Structure formats: structure tokens, C-alpha cells
């Protein structure tokens, strides 16, 4: 995640589409977004069979998040209220292994990404019901206004696949929705 942002800001990449949630804060800091292509929220997952059933069970424990992510912001917003600490990781697979291995009690991540990983890899985790926040749209992001043509082409292509039904087919195939 951080490497993608740095590459774009350094001009080594023209844009990124790695689950970049469209937020006012990101827009204010110079991100330029396409139209939203998927609404996603963040939620909490625990090791399969864990006694943790909600945020209130995290008191005195540590949770994992990806550095500089929406899930990190979400967990940080809950930490004081529920008495847990936040531990930062650079990628989801390492974070998930920390949950399964017991180094942390839970993790926060984008719900569709986490659900897909659990399903596809069989990793011993489960998403805790009732822990999701309000969804935000993912967008294709650029950091240089000279690349506006990329955003325009992306938006046109997105509109086309939504209009002809291809978008719905992709979502159904890969996300089961």
C-alpha cells in the first residue's frame, strides 16, 4: 500500500487502484479520484473459535491493521473507547497470520478483501458480525493532474461496463454478490 502511494507520488506509476477509498482527507492531500467503482466497509476478524464476539471483548488486547489504511483509521477511532492497542503491518497476509498465530487478538481490514482471503485461502479466521463501519467507495487514484486523461478513460470504461451488465457479472463472479 505505502509503496503504491510512494510510486505514484514519485512519478514512477501513473495511478493506483489498490482498494483506495475515496475520502475528503485524501482529496485534500492531493489525491485525484475516479468515480467510485465499489462500495466497501471495514470490519473486524478474529481467529476461528475465538471468544471475541465484539469490540467490548478487546479491552487490554492488541489488534492488527495495515499502515495508513481506512481500516487503521477505523480501529484507531475505537481504540480508546474499547481499551485496545493498535499494531501496524505492511500487508494483509502478514496481518492475518498474526491473528491466526495469536500475536494479536483481531484485525481490521476491508471487508470484501478479508472475506475473499478467508474464502480463497481457508485461513482460520472469521469476520465478527456487527463490526462493520459505514461503506466508502473505492476509486482509481492519481496524484498528478497531468494524468487526468487516465481518470476520464477509467470513468468512461466503468460507465460502459455498468451499462452493459459486465460490471454486475464481475461482481457476482468474484465477490458472490
Each language-model region and where it sits:
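Acidic, polar ligand-binding/catalytic clefts
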Residues: 1-57, 126, 132
Amino acid at each position: 500500500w505505502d509503496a503504491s502511494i510512494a510510486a505514484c507520488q514519485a512519478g514512477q506509476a501513473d495511478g493506483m487502484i489498490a482498494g483506495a477509498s475515496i475520502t475528503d482527507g485524501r482529496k485534500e492531500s492531493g489525491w485525484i479520484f475516479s468515480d467510485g467503482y465499489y462500495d466497501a466497509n471495514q470490519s473486524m476478524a478474529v481467529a476461528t473459535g475465538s471468544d471475541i464476539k465484539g469490540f467490548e471483548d478487546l479491552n487490554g488486547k492488541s489488534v492488527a491493521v495495515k499502515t495508513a489504511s481506512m481500516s487503521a483509521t477505523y480501529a484507531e477511532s475505537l481504540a480508546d473507547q474499547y481499551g485496545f492497542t493498535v499494531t501496524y503491518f505492511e500487508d494483509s497476509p502478514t496481518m492475518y497470520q498474526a491473528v491466526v498465530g495469536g500475536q494479536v487478538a483481531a484485525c481490521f481490514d476491508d471487508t470484501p478483501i478479508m472475506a475473499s482471503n478467508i474464502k480463497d485461502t481457508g485461513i482460520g479466521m472469521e469476520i465478527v458480525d456487527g463490526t462493520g463501519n459505514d461503506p466508502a467507495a473505492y476509486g482509481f487514484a492519481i496524484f498528478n493532474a497531468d494524468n487526468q486523461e487516465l481518470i476520464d478513460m477509467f470513468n468512461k470504461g466503468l460507465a460502459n461496463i455498468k451499462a452493459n451488465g459486465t460490471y454486475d457479472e464481475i461482481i457476482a463472479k468474484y465477490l458472490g454478490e
